[in-house]
């Protein structure tokens, strides 16, 4: 039995797990999906209540290329290179990344320095997100829906309090089951193997 409970945006890891399990037909693979956050509804323009939903990072870059104002980027360093197409990116972006040398190195290689690199380990409280939004005078917060364990709700609260627009990169579509369904499937699997 293999349970893939990786981060909802870890598509490469999930693909590798599936590929490895396909080599062994006797292995049962379960994909446990984190519950998505419930943010406020969107209107037909997709921008009600200061929340914009985009499909991916490239779409977020396109959207923000047409806007002015600083950007609090909470999506880490892995896709930071995609933001080089944003006009004024080195001045506008404040990137919060993991406090590890590899993440900081990526930021520096791309030209970011000083206060534009925020190396901290989350998840963060709504107050900490709010303080950072205000400190860097950000009009936008870019995030992914990491669910409750990823601090998504706190980010949305902070953006609303700060008057910043939240640009949410939606989760990739994936098939799987909830935590509760996964628990039940494991129980059934345990019954089957013990008989």
Language-model features and meaning:
Residues 1, 70, 139-140:
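Structural motif
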Residues 1-60:
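Glycine/small-residue-rich loop that forms an oxyanion/phosphate-binding "nest" at active or ligand-binding sites
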Residues 3, 30-31, 142-143, 166-170:
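Short hydrophobic alpha-helical runs that function as membrane-insertion/retention elements
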Residues 22-29, 91, 161-165:
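A short helix->loop->beta-strand "cap" motif at the edges of active sites that frequently abuts
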Residues 49-57, 178-188:
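Short acidic-hydrophobic, aromatic-tinged amphipathic segments that line or gate anion-handling sites
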Residues 69-70, 74-116:
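Anionic-ligand binding region
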Residues 100-103, 166-177:
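Short, flexible loop segments at boundaries between secondary-structure elements
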Residues 108-131, 135-136, 140-162, 171:
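A C-terminal functional module that forms or caps the active site or interfaces directly
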């Amino acid at each position: 039995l293999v349970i893939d409970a990786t981060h909802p945006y870890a598509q490469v890891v999930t693909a590798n797990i599936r590929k490895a399990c396909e080599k062994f037909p006797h292995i049962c693979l379960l994909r446990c999906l984190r519950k998505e956050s419930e943010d406020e509804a969107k209107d037909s323009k997709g921008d009600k209540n200061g929340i914009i939903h985009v499909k991916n990072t490239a779409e977020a870059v396109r959207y923000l290329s047409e806007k002015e104002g600083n950007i609090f980027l909470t999506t880490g360093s892995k896709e930071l290179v995609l933001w080089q197409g944003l006009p004024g990116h080195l001045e506008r972006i404040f990137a919060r990344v993991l406090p590890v040398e590899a993440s900081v190195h990526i930021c520096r290689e791309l030209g970011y320095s000083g206060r534009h690199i925020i190396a901290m380990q989350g998840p963060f409280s709504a107050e900490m997100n709010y303080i950072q939004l205000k400190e860097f005078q950000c009009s936008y917060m870019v995030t992914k829906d990491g669910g409750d364990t990823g601090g998504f709700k706190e980010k949305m609260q902070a953006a609303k309090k700060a008057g910043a627009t939240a640009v949410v990169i939606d989760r990739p579509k994936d098939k799987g089951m909830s935590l509760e369904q996964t628990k039940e499937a494991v129980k059934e699997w345990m019954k089957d193997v013990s008989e």
